[in-house]
Amino acid sequence: MHTVELRFYEELNDYLPVARRKCCFTHAFDGTPAVKDVIEALGVPHTEIDLILVDGESVRFAHRLHGGERVAVYPMFERFAIRPLHGLRPQPLRRTLFVVDVHLGRLARYLRLLGFDTLYATDLDDAALIAISVRGRRVLLTRDVGLLKHKVLTRGYWLRSTNPNRQVEEVVHALSLEKDLQPFTRCMSCNGVVRPIARSEVAGRVPPRVFKRFRRFTCCLGCRRIYWRGTHFQRLERLSRRRRFTRARHRA
């Protein structure tokens, strides 16, 4: 039997029992397991980890532990390069894309409202979600911790909140996306890009009273849905402005 001293930082502490949060603790193990296996045995999915230091040196997930080491584990720095340290994903994302688990439809719509490319469908099983995430380099958003422990996944985030309003704030904070908000540039229904369209082109495609009242229209390039600044738009605009998109104050 061997032991190792571990310390988890920032939001990774959410996965740990209270007694092990924000402090060093000792963990016992047999053999020479990979550091990834030890970490996930403690409940922390590898997709939320971007840096592991063993005795002050950055290591890969496959690094073997022999006992007596001190291990520090840090969350993903999704938008920042951390070289020359060994980040545990191929490279940080410069444009963050999402795929959302099947029970998170409202979150998907809110992310699209804010301008983020977000794939969502109610018929996607776990295998499909994982494949889309890996192939498209999309961050998989889910409430299922077990899903994030799949070995081929490299990008994922476990949502702490069950409230869609809180969830969208949580995602923006966790991935440092405050400066990337582009409200009303994506279709909330299909995720297509929304562009301005000439008023003359919407004649007959919107109710006569709408055509008479409004001068500016936009159109989804995917599903061709027409948008205008009516009551629905104003309600969504209030929703967008109400999001508390200020930097989260996490402390290790």
Regions found by a protein language model. Give the residues of each.
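Ubiquitin-like/PB1-type beta-grasp interaction modules and other compact soluble beta-rich domains
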Residues: 1-97
